[in-house]
Amino acid sequence: IREKLILPHVALKSEYYDLSLLNRNDTDDQVTVDAANATKKYGVAVKCATITPNKQRMEEYPQLKKLWPSPNGTIRSILDGTVFRTPILIDAVHPAVRNWKKPITVARHAYGDVYKAVDLHTDEPGECTMTFRGESGRETTLSIQKVDGPAVFQGQHNKEKSIRSFARACFQYALDIKQDLWFSTKDTISKIYDGTFRSIFDEEFEDYRARFDALGLTYFYTLIDDAVARVIRSQGGFIWACKNYDGDVMSDMISTAFGSLAMMTSVLVSPDGCWEYEAAHGTVTKHYYRYLRGEQTSTNPLATIFAWSGALRKRGELDALPELTAFADRLEQASLDTLSAGTMTGDLSALVEPGFSARTVSSAEFLDAVAARL
């Protein structure tokens, strides 16, 4: 994408950080921290999909020193902020949910919860407790569970400051794009943890209520299971704010139901004004292995193209470079026009409406077709 679509038109002034699994291994993951700090320094970043290793990957990469954490988790922890994910719609592909007419943006809290959790596996009977030791010296201990055999435990956290930043980002984003905001947790079960999220959202909304009313916008809270039912019955056209894990899962569901996971934009917005753009999907491992075998792949690059266009547009806005923002617009329009003309990758050609003439091309051929329209 960079070589075919960006460099022929833009004199990039960028720093590059190699977040490949082996380089993260070689640097003891310091490169990920450096990349996050560089994003804080420069304000705008583009991130490619990365590998988070599991036990299977340890067998594939025996040189790995450990199961390195998710680079996304590390970066989001450093930047804090909120991830906004919005599907890219085209006329030739209708959503699997027939009544969806407008995009649904998932606002995902980008800090804490299971992504900063600690896990414990035990092999004997006993009791697991959780202790908070304040700087004052005061301690609070809770019993998690007594077990009569092997068990697993997990401890997770979040910070009120981060939750407030999340709430404010969601309310401001709703005002910016003039859409209703929904927020969902499970505070009937998680009365303190999820209940704190709900209380903070309710408190912060009071500072935005008048502006919401002036625009005729609505904010409402509902339980996560009720929210899922409401989303499916809706026509779309709103922002759905979710905790970290809920947003991870639901954004994949939303993007796939709208057409393809490769048709969803993703931007992390931090409280201090940093913007990190990426594709919402992962590394598409099976396609990569086929590519290594010399086979042609038809992998949809649109979300990564839009990550580049989003970052270039934001850079242009911040630096008052209208030519750069105009190029970002042209890049997106060239990509959409290519799809409208029937040139598309296999994930989309299998979903087009009856009567639409689609030609399935490889990833490289699709990029060439977009480049020809720039």
Segments (PLM) and residue ranges:
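Glycine-rich phosphate/diphosphate-binding loop of Rossmann-like nucleotide-binding domains
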Residues: 1-7, 130-222
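N-terminal beta-loop-helix "entrance" segment that forms/cooperates
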Residues: 9-33
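Flexible, glycine/charged-enriched surface loops at secondary-structure junctions
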Residues: 9-16, 177-185, 209-221, 316-328, ...
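Active-site rim loops that border cofactor/substrate pockets in soluble metabolic enzymes
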Residues: 16, 21, 193-240, 244, ...
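Glycine-rich phosphate/nucleotide-binding loop
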Residues: 21-24, 231-341
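N-terminal glycine-rich phosphate/adenylate-binding segment common to multiple enzyme folds
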Residues: 24-139, 245, 249
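Glycine-rich phosphate/pyrophosphate-binding loop and the adjoining helix
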Residues: 110-112, 116-167, 174, 321, ...
